[in-house]
Amino acid sequence: MNNMAGNTPEVVDWFARARRLQKQQLHQLAQQGTLAGQISALVHMLQCERGASNIWLCSGGRLYAAECRAGAALVDEQLTRFYAALEPARDAASSALCWRIACAVWYLPQLAALRKRVRDREIAAEEATGQFSRIIRHLLNIVPQLNDSIDDPQIAGRMVALYSFMQGKELAGQERALGALGFARGQFSDELRQQLVDRIDGQQPCFDSFQALAQPPQTALFAEQCQASLEIEQLRRVACTRQPPADEGETALRWFCAQTQRLEQLRGVEELLIVDLLNAADALLEGEEPEAQLPPADWQEDSIALRLDKQLLPLVRQQAHELQQLSGQLASLKDALEERKLIEKAKSVLMTYQGMQEEQAWQALRKMAMDKNQRMVEIARALLTVKALWRVTPKE
């Protein structure tokens, strides 16, 4: 009964086709990993050019002229590699991926006009930073679309880890640009300060996602080398809580150099993530070489069912994990709302008892949090706890 069909030519053809398609999909997987690596390298070069252009504009054309030229040359060199990596992905790309690539490719030629305006100092530093950031954003948007076509959990996890890390690194790059702008001017407006705070706060969720999915060697290197240095933390405190000194750009260069060193360390981890992704894809490709075009000799319905069960079990576990994550996210959202309420109450206390404006109260809470190396909600909670002990009459 089990051998009724036998190894007929039709059966052999179907197994051979399955092997060929599997190998083709693995080749596409390797190509997607290569494309992600080229995007990462191009984004890093653009971040370098954005930073140099920002200092050039903020210094009134006194500093970083050579760095601007070098940055542009490195970007152009990497662009050639990026376009070459696009070609193998063209035939197998989904419509959604094609849209993302089209948007990025549409913005890239605008670099020439942007560079001319920077070189001639016909553009404000904020606008130049925004245009560089827009180009980078469209390049980064390609990466998650690559992940949608990956059905191997190991490769998918590595791709998400890489994308999360790239997002966090880009926020660190924007932090460098915004901080350099404020320090060079000797003044942080409320809007610029809020933008800086948003970039600082936005990095942690990205790096948390990276650490949850990356391999131990990469997370260990990140923890060892990529945290914000003491100098960065001190300058962050100045930028977020008071106006910087007017020192003809000296503090701006200190900030820029410290942030650049951190970005280069982040790039080192990013390169490890890419190597690990490509190695994992190559290992799958080598491990799936067909040993024969025929099915195994003991192939039968029971063994097929067993293999299907083994394939379904990880999916079930993955769904359970996703549900657990969703529950955790909902709980985190609830906690975040409660924390926000505590901070608002603490602001009200400062406004009532110290006669502060809302912005002043917020800045005071943030400064206390930075000085004590604590979260703002912890300061707010402590303030509300001791409120009952105050014997100060509220100011009119």
From Swiss-Prot:
Keywords: RNA-binding, Transcription, Transcription antitermination, Transcription regulation. Nitrate- and nitrite-responsive positive regulator for nasFEDCBA operon expression. NasR protein binds to the factor-independent terminator site located in the nasF operon leader RNA to effect transcription antitermination. One of its GO terms (biological process) is transcription antitermination. Pfam families: ANTAR, NIT. Residues 323-384 form the ANTAR domain. This is Nitrate regulatory protein. It comes from Klebsiella oxytoca. It comes from the Bacteria. GO terms for molecular function: RNA binding. Gene3D superfamilies: Winged helix-like DNA-binding domain superfamily/Winged helix DNA-binding domain (1.10.10.10). The keyword Transcription regulation applies. Residues 37-284 form the NIT domain. The keyword Nucleus does not apply.
